[in-house]
Amino acid sequence: MAKFKIRPATASDCSDILRLIKELAKYEYMEDQVILTEKDLQEDGFGEHPFYHCLVAEVPKEHWTPEGHSIVGFAMYYFTYDPWIGKLLYLEDFFVMSDYRGFGIGSEILKNLSQVAMKCRCSSMHFLVAEWNEPSINFYKRRGASDLSSEEGWRLFKIDKEYLLKMAAEE
């Protein structure tokens, strides 16, 4: 399958983006944690101040999924800032449906993301990968990615909404 196109997502792609987010979550054994809705995606990514950007991989009709989907992959990203090195492209989610892997779709998405990062003068692209996800780790390493958790010893933390509310209310 040589025919596919990578393009910026539009608001009308949100149902497909949500479908792929859920497929990725299932692949990562976390499908019960997706609480986002299609409406959230539309408001958060396509409003006046988008919180994320998204690329989608679209195949022609002859390669649609058995369920009739033309969108078979996506990458959700946003820009952030590191006071040591400057602008970063943060890759939040990246997924290609299993039946469509091995055709260069993921590589082309990553190429497009790299072009976006260079156009915006980003110093690097950051992302997380589950420790058990060797295929993805190898995919990224083949393209020059370094594992900061082992090289620099960083740990990822989060503060849930419950605690954010508590801290915000403190006097």
Swiss-Prot record:
Domain of life: Eukaryota
One term under GO cellular component: cytosol
UniProt binding sites for acetyl-CoA: 94-96, 102-107, 133-136, 140-143
pH dependence (UniProt free text): Optimum pH is 8.5-9.5.
CDD domains recorded: NAT_SF (cd04301)
Listed EC numbers: 2.3.1.57
Residue ranges constituting the N-acetyltransferase domain according to the UniProt record: 4-170
Pathway involvement of the protein, from the record: Amine and polyamine degradation; putrescine degradation; N-acetylputrescine from putrescine: step 1/1
BP GO annotations: angiogenesis; polyamine biosynthetic process; putrescine catabolic process; regulation of cell population proliferation; spermidine acetylation; spermine catabolic process
Annotated binding of substrate, by residue: Y27, E28, E92, H126, F127, L128, E152
Result of altering D93N: Reduced activity
Localization (cell): Cytoplasm, Cytosol
Pfam families reported in the protein's UniProt record: Acetyltransf_1 (PF00583)
GO molecular function: diamine N-acetyltransferase activity; identical protein binding; N-acetyltransferase activity; spermidine binding
Catalytic activity line of the entry: an alkane-alpha,omega-diamine + acetyl-CoA = an N-acetylalkane-alpha,omega-diamine + CoA + H(+); spermidine + acetyl-CoA = N(1)-acetylspermidine + CoA + H(+); spermine + acetyl-CoA = N(1)-acetylspermine + CoA + H(+)
Main localisation: cytoplasm
Enzyme class: transferase
Active site: Y140
Keywords: Acyltransferase, Cytoplasm, Transferase
Family, per entry: Belongs to the acetyltransferase family.
Physiological role: Enzyme which catalyzes the acetylation of polyamines. Substrate specificity: norspermidine = spermidine >> spermine > N(1)-acetylspermine. This highly regulated enzyme allows a fine attenuation of the intracellular concentration of polyamines. Also involved in the regulation of polyamine transport out of cells. Also acts on 1,3-diaminopropane and 1,5-diaminopentane.
Known partners and oligomeric status: Homodimer.
Protein name, per record: Diamine acetyltransferase 1
Originating organism: Mus musculus (Mouse)
Source taxonomy: Eukaryota, Metazoa, Chordata, Craniata, Vertebrata
Gene name in the database record: Sat1
